[in-house]
Amino acid sequence: MKLEESLKKCPVIKRGEYNYFVHPITDGIPLVEPSLLREVACRILKIVDFSEVDKIVTAEAMGIHLATTLSLYTDIPFVIIRKRSYGLEGEIPVFQKTGYSKGQLYVNGIKEGDKVVIVDDVISTGGTMIAIIEALKRAGAEIKDIVCVIERGKGREIVEKKTGYKIKTLVKIDVVDGKVVIK
């Protein structure tokens, strides 16, 4: 499959002590091939039931292309959790911390009773996902499913234990000796 093959070839860089893999799905570089994006979307569509979903929710920035593609396939609108405040009525600020960054995220466009699927590119520490889940619960949304394309580290387990929500992933990886390894 293209996703796994492309992961095996992607470069790994250091961000402080964090080994950061650089991949089209997670970083938009070096090049996002339509066939790779299509494969990822089709694989998500096979494992997530969108039939009772009102909105697809993703975090800025690297979930946007995933949510856009899924929205085009399903005709379900999507909401982007942004890194800056717009000051709109009902905006929900939420703090998130990852393995290499931290800061505020802002949720807009979610109403009480909305049925949502959360889509993200990668889950590694779980910090962003926990923040998103907490914000959506505060807004009164019903989380129908959660899917992350790439799983790395213990983030999925941490989120599931802390929130009670199961997270689906397409591929699990690790970084060993400066290379991505498929598990």
UniProtKB/Swiss-Prot annotation:
InterPro entries reported in the protein's UniProt record: HGPRTase-like, PRibTrfase_dom, PRTase-like, Pur/Pyrimidine_PRTase
Record SUPFAM superfamilies: PRTase-like
Annotated catalysed reactions: IMP + diphosphate = hypoxanthine + 5-phospho-alpha-D-ribose 1-diphosphate; GMP + diphosphate = guanine + 5-phospho-alpha-D-ribose 1-diphosphate
Job of this protein: Catalyzes a salvage reaction resulting in the formation of IMP that is energically less costly than de novo synthesis.
Family: Belongs to the purine/pyrimidine phosphoribosyltransferase family. Archaeal HPRT subfamily.
MF terms (GO), sorted A to Z: guanine phosphoribosyltransferase activity; hypoxanthine phosphoribosyltransferase activity
Protein name: Hypoxanthine/guanine phosphoribosyltransferase
Localisation per UniProt entry: Cytoplasm
Documented EC number(s): 2.4.2.8
